[in-house]
């Protein structure tokens, strides 16, 4: 029997022993009235005596049994506090229970505070109760020379068993607490800007709003094929048509694509649409929102991301899509007239463009490989090719291009925005072009959406739209270097 299995058997045996004593190892309820951090801070300012009792609940973090007295530490979701328990205070039965506790056990305690001779605030335990047994031993975390070592260092295992990861790694829990604050702050900011939060379908008869492969499902009663949404965009713009002038949705999207440090098939997106807005109003909104979040969450506009100090102070740099590709690859795609020439130049840079069917698809691969990783400081990339932007309004001053921008920071895209195309005739032509690309083998090309065309035929005001990837934004604001570090339960291969 392995050491781990032997420990599990020992802990199960302890449960059986408690049952024989008539003690329920999984009692129905226990109501703490305090948090360890709160009572310690208050005690430091205003010490209390044995007459002031506190009830705490949490996990046993450490334990030292010394005959008739024991020291231990309790960890709750606010912090860690030292415990002092004696046989005289607890009595034979409860002290026996206390001594038999294992690290990780969830316990309920009552007691009063005092300071040890070393000055550590400690809970003098007067009552103890096992609330839930930790049957499986927790990984042991150790620190040496500022580096943390534990038996849970395998990243894949941490993602797969996030519940254990959260128990043993405080920084992981802190990341997800920060994520929650970011999401709440986004909602608050947009609400103050006059946006109304709405919900649109997760299952859609047509996968639209983005260039991506969808997940396919089937509705049995209606006998119809449905897609998990790849984006909410076309439904949100239907609401603009309906007179809801400022709307946003913060929810999940699903794309049947690869997994990487920047991609997870299930991810969170915020999309906002503003009637009588355009690319410039959404650019201003993006800059204000992200700088607001940085100041609110990080307390500064200069944040450390890996080895880079990123300065989010406005105004952010701006440059065009064509110019940024030329800067980092030497290729001016605006001057290339044949697909063969585009592929040749890309291949010389060792960029795989074998599946690209158009010049601008080649350009986009070159951008992703050569330019994007270098965009560390915040920058808005503007003036995208019309071909790559089937839902964006054409730029009247630059034929072949659209009023679109994408914000980049820390070497990755964190959003996408444009002046929305509201001409139903132009939109139908672009959908038709996308259908041709789809028929030619591009399974990420858009599908035709006749109902959306019909909605535009009722008239949509000039509109600005914005999408921001929440997971990537959280990566930036928490100094996380994989998207899976910002998603509680990322998709994993089967064990």
From Swiss-Prot:
The protein's assembly and partners: Homodimer.
Name used for this protein in its record: Lysine--tRNA ligase
Gene Ontology annotations for the cellular component aspect, listed alphabetically: cytosol
Keyword Methyltransferase applies: no
GO molecular function ontology, one term from the record: ATP binding
GO BP of this protein: lysyl-tRNA aminoacylation
Subcellular location: Cytoplasm
Keyword terms, alphabetized: Aminoacyl-tRNA synthetase, ATP-binding, Cytoplasm, Ligase, Magnesium, Metal-binding, Nucleotide-binding, Protein biosynthesis
Listed EC numbers: 6.1.1.6
Primary location: cytoplasm
Positions of Mg(2+) 1 binding: 406, 413
Catalytic EC class: ligase
Encoding gene, per UniProt annotation: lysS
Membership in a protein family: Belongs to the class-II aminoacyl-tRNA synthetase family.
């Amino acid at each position: 029997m392995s050491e781990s299995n032997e420990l599990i058997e020992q802990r199960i045996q302890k449960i059986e022993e408690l049952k024989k004593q008539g003690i329920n190892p999984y009692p129905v309820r226990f109501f703490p009235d305090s948090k360890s951090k709160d009572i310690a801070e208050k005690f430091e300012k205003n010490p209390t005596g044995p007459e002031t009792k506190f009830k705490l609940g949490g996990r046993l973090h450490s334990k030292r049994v010394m005959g008739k007295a024991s020291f231990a530490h309790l960890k709750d979701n606010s912090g860690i506090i030292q415990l002092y328990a004696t046989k005289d205070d607890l009595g034979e039965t409860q002290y026996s229970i206390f001594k038999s506790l294992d690290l990780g056990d969830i316990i309920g305690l009552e007691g009063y505070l005092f300071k040890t001779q070393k000055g550590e605030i400690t809970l003098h335990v007067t009552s103890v109760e096992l609330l839930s047994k930790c049957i499986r031993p927790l990984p042991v975390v150790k620190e040496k020379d500022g580096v943390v070592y534990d038996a849970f260092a395998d990243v894949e295992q941490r993602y797969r068993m996030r519940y254990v990861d959260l128990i043993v790694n405080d920084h992981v829990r802190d990341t997800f607490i920060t994520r929650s604050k970011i999401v709440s702050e986004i909602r608050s900011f947009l609400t103050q800007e006059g946006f109304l939060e709405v919900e649109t379908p997760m299952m859609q008869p047509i996968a639209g709003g983005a260039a991506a492969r969808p997940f396919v499902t089937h509705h049995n009663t209606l006998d119809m094929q449905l897609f998990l949404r790849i984006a909410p965009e076309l439904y949100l713009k239907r609401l603009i048509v309906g007179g809801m002038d400022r709307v946003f949705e913060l929810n999940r999207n699903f794309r049947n694509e690869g997994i990487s440090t920047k991609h997870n098939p299930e991810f969170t997106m915020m999309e906002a649409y503003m009637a009588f807005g355009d690319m410039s109003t959404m650019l201003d909104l993006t800059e204000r929102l992200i700088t607001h979040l940085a100041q609110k969450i990080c307390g500064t506009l200069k944040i450390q991301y890996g080895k880079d100090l990123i300065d989010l102070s406005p105004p952010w740099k701006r440059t065009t899509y064509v110019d940024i590709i030329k800067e980092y690859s030497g290729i001016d795609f605006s001057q290339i007239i044949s697909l063969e020439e585009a592929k040749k130049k890309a291949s010389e840079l060792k960029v795989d463009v074998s599946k690209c069917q158009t010049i601008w698809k080649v350009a986009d691969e070159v951008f992703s490989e050569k330019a994007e990783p270098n965009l560390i400081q915040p920058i808005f990339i503007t003036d995208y090719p019309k071909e790559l932007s089937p839902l964006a309004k054409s730029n009247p001053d630059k034929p072949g291009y659209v009023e679109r921008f994408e914000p980049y920071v820390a070497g990755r895209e964190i959003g996408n925005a444009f002046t929305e195309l509201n001409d139903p005739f132009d939109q139908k032509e672009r959908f038709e072009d996308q259908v041709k690309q789809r028929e030619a083998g591009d399974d990420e090309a858009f599908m035709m959406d006749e109902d959306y065309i019909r909605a535009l035929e009722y008239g949509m005001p000039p509109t600005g739209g914005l999408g921001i990837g929440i997971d990537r934004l959280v990566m930036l604001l928490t100094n996380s270097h994989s998207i899976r570090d910002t998603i509680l339960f990322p998709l994993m291969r089967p064990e």
